[in-house]
Amino acid sequence: MTDSDHRLPDRPGEGDPGRGRRIGIDVGSVRVGVATSDPDGVLATPVETVRREKSSDRHVRRLAQLVTELEAVEVVVGLPRTLADRTGPAAHDAIDVAEALARRIAPVPVRMADERLTTVSAQRSLREAGVRAKGQRAMIDQVAAVGILQSWLDQRRAALAAPGEGGHG
């Protein structure tokens, strides 16, 4: 068993790098959704969908390029644990991408955030907004990345506001 077999989500606010943009990433088998926050870490917005390449690391290079372009201080990758709170194949895949990205962008921290049901929630939001299933494919990964990052930002803000909690943000 490797460390990734026991990988749990990180807690927002721990080791917080302070003010600056964050990037949220939703790792899918075909596409990777990317979102970013404003420098104050209040609002997550979609950035782009990166095509996933199993045979190369081109998608990881593009993610690293976005971290540099957006001057991100922290990256949050969705960890899709099963509803039984286990690390399944999708979670191992996300961990592999996160670790490859972390090697490229050090010392910028890469965190793992619980993302159970994020894609389901994103699909529901798009459906309620009147986006047809066919049109959702192009947007779903970015919307899921926004959900992952917004949840992280909200939890981070609460953790940093709590007495004796969080980092130095």
From Swiss-Prot:
What family does the Swiss-Prot or TrEMBL record give for this protein? Belongs to the YqgF nuclease family.
Q: Which GO terms describe its cellular component?
A: cytosol
Region spans: Disordered: 1-24
Q: For this UniProt record, give its keywords in alphabetical order, as a comma-separated list.
A: Cytoplasm, Hydrolase, Nuclease, Ribosome biogenesis
Q: Can you say what this protein is called?
A: Putative pre-16S rRNA nuclease
Natural source organism: Mycobacterium sp. (strain KMS)
Where is the protein localized? Cytoplasm
Q: What does this protein do?
A: Could be a nuclease involved in processing of the 5'-end of pre-16S rRNA.
Keyword Cytoplasm listed = yes
InterPro entries xrefs: RNaseH-like_sf, YqgF, YqgF/RNaseH-like_dom, YqgF/RNaseH-like_dom_sf
Q: What is its main location?
A: cytoplasm
Instruction: Tell me where on the tree of life, at the top rank, the source sits.
Output: Bacteria
The Basic and acidic residues compositionally biased stretches are 1-19
**A Pfam family this protein belongs to?**
RuvX
User: What SUPFAM superfamilies does the annotation carry?
Assistant: Ribonuclease H-like (SSF53098)
A molecular-function term among this protein's GO annotations: nuclease activity
EC nos: 3.1.-.-
Nuclease among keywords: yes
| PANTHER family in the cross-refs | POLYNUCLEOTIDYL TRANSFERASE, RIBONUCLEASE H-LIKE SUPERFAMILY PROTEIN
Its GO biological process annotations read: rRNA 5'-end processing
